[in-house]
Amino acid sequence: MDAVEFSKGHGTENDFVVLPDPEAALELTASKVAALCDRRAGIGADGVLRVAKAGKLLDAGVLDALPDGVASDDWFMDYRNGDGSIAEMCGNGVRVFAHYLAAAGWESRTDYVVGSRAGAKPVTVHSGDAVHGAVTVAMGLVRELGPSTASLAGWAYPGIGIDVGNPHLACVAADLSGDDLAKLDLTVPPGYDPDLFPQGVNIEFVTPLPTGAEPAVDMRVYERGVGETRSCGTGTVAAAAAVLHREGFRIAEDSGEVRVRVPGGAVSVRLAGGQAWLRGPSVLLAHGRLAGEWWLEH
């Protein structure tokens, strides 16, 4: 088998292996994804972004149907978690995906739609050279799922369930200092209510920062199928919605903007009328080829 091309990129240090596969010709199994994301025996990443046309993924049987708003000729982000499981959406991943298309010369438009399993995600590429990019992603509908609680190290953290195309439990802990937040042991999976989240959930721990021109928070996240990551795009949207909700914000009606700091950097989240937009950076740092023999072995 021929070598398989790849790139490596990250959005606020949420890192990905990018597989350019416009014809959806690669057999991308869970074991291959997990091997690629292995930080000792593979390239190492939080997840894999396959770059393909939506119609080709449909023809190959990767998709059973085109998601809402996604056309056959749209670029589609076939996103996989680091353990090989399929995920609906990744906000940081969409930024890296759109940046890659610009850097590779596959897409010259600055405004277009990226398909995902959570539906069509319009993007605006503000800048994108060979290394650095800045992208805004229209994240779509933000829906409140109701109050719930996460548990960690014997402590309960009240939060609110938020759907951003994938499920989140955002816990705003105003009494936690920045140092306290940094000391939380997220090597251990937090507990949650499986009745509310039967498919698992991404859990955010959020600390509001002193109010400036716009609300700002610090956030750490435990992603289902991955563990703690340096950033989570949909998680930052959930965190922003939760901290505004705590102040009386009506998710389906009001508008507001929050700057969210994560261990890997910072992004801006805007919410209006139940919709969200995420703006942040992207970095493409390496390109290479996977040995065909290694690919076949996994």
Q: What do these predicted ranges mean?
A:
Residues 143-147, 285-287:
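Short, charged/polar, Gly/Pro-enriched secondary-structure boundary elements
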Residues 140-142, 266:
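Short, solvent-exposed aromatic-acidic interface loops
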